[in-house]
Amino acid sequence: MYARNFNRRGRGNLGSTSVSRGLTPRSYVWSWKPVNSGSDRYCYPAITDVVNQQAQFIERDRNNALNEMAHLLSTMSTTELRASGYAMAGLQIAEQRINDYCAKEVRLEAASEDMLLLSTAMRIGEIVRLDDAANDDVVRSFDLDVVGPVMGTISSQGPLELMITLRTSQKIPAHWSDRCSVSKLIFDIPFKRMLIALRDLVSYPWARPPLHQVVYLGATPRFYGRALLDSDFVDESLNQSQKDAVQLAITANAIALIHGPPGTGKTRVLIEIIRQQIKLMRKLSGTSLGVSSSGSPPHTTSAGAISNSAVIRSKQVVLSSLLNAGGRDLRGDSGYCGDFDVVIIDNATQAFEGESWIAALKAPKLILAGDSNQLYPMFKNADGSAVIAGGSLGSQPPHMTLFERVLGKHGDKVSRTLQIQYRMHADIMQVSANELYKDNIVADGSVAGHVLCDLEHVETNEYTRAPLVLLETAGRGITESLHGSGTFKGRTTMMSTGPESWINTGEAQLAMTHVEKLLAAGVDVNDIAIFPFYDAQVALLKGLGEERYPELEIGSVDTSQGREKEAVVLSMVRSNPGKEVGFLKDVRLMNVALTRARRHLCIIADSSTVSEGDPFLTALFVHLKSKALILHPST
């Protein structure tokens, strides 16, 4: 949320990007020029050291991602790239249309009825290129510097069709309708905008505001203003911990943190903060406030309708993603404080520190909301492996989040934790509450005992009465295997996202069988989700289920944060003699997985493999043995 007052403009040197072309192995270099704090009285070593460290990390992350793709291009054939999901060929254009936001959309279908479009390397939100299927070189080029004629964003995806929202209204050649291809692009604008934000942070040309001093220079956080009365709250149903969080945010001079465990109503708190801020601004200005969103949907048409920047400049409250906050529409006259009065960043624990500064530089006051026990941002190692960020609070590594840095420095002085959750049955919540939140969250009475059979039209049976179900596969011959292309019902599928992912066909079949039992009991398909822990397993399950149940949500755990369903089925996938569990031992990922379900959580797992992989997993299976309905199915 922002309040506008554009008046200044930033300056600085970002550096340069060098990309060599061709289909041979390539080396990508982004040159960040380290900043010297000696020449500027407002450029403190405590800030320049962090900025240089952050910039080098971002530079390394970006280069690793590009070099990984370059390696794939140099070692995999075009057929292998397609089979691995980085490209799709044999597509035809089924429809072109203008959507409600005046953007052009293209709906693609498989040209052959025996192919399912199940690439998991290209997800909703990915930047892709649409091109002539005959142009093989295009399929083997993934660089934004080698852009084909038509680019867009995947807006929806299913086993039988793909919807792409185009970035421009360019005309698509007629001969593409019968045969075209889609390939994944590397999108490096986020890296550039993070570096621009860090440049602006370090080259700030005036005396440092309290926000900078509190975050980096050891200043004490301060709070002003009277305490809010119960009658002051717009949402009178907020609980006391939620009201305390609103109070902290409204009275903070520079920064406040809101720690929102799963289901605790963090969004309601942020809405109340925005309402309170609007009330305050109305008192000060005596005017009403306009609201707008930035980035998507666009406010432009080919006929020359009003532009995004013009719309935004007429509003005082703006909603934006962090990435769009660094775009032209919100760049304004300055990259610095004074553009807005307050910035609120939701899910701040999923953003790198440099990413948060894209928006945070636009106001003297910052409110961060998130949960450090849920998903962190991910970065690439030099070997191409994905690593979840976050380290110990004391070490302050370059890949930590701004939320984590401030919490580590100031703790409870600037932070409030929401303590009552309104989503999960108490048995579903219990492991996370015990192991991660020190028993500081409790289930509200309205949800503590609710189960599926309490829903209208759902019959009562052993499944719908049980909040927890464990489908135990140990000793059943249901084992994992490495991913690859496969066939379901005679159709070819693409099931890969890179060098290593795992599938478990037995677990996939058990997941679908369990879903069918819930449906037979009257549970609505829209109230059910399947969340596997591996992308290849997602593709496998989509091949089994999406054609029969197109409304059934099937997605990977790492895309499920913030979502909830009445019933959730988790496929753990891993089952092997060596008891290797991979990233199942990532406690934050497991916490997200376990806290999506409201009334019914079914876990499909080989306990002999998974239960010994990590102390958190051990605690989980101890809890399941005590509280769950345990079944020993055979496929």
Show which residues each predicted segment covers.
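Pre-ATPase regulatory/linker segments immediately N-terminal to the P-loop/RecA-like helicase/translocase core
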Residues: 2-55, 59, 100-243, 247, ...
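N-terminal pre-P-loop "Q-motif" helix
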Residues: 235-254, 261, 269, 507
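Walker A/P-loop NTP-binding motif
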Residues: 251, 267-282
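Conserved beta-strand scaffold positions in the cores of enzyme catalytic domains, especially
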Residues: 257, 283, 290, 319, ...
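ATP-binding Walker
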Residues: 264
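Short acidic low-complexity segments
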Residues: 302-311, 553-560
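Conserved helicase/translocase P-loop NTPase motor core
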Residues: 304-337, 509-511
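Conserved helicase motor core of SF1/SF2 NTP-dependent helicases
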Residues: 323-325, 336-635
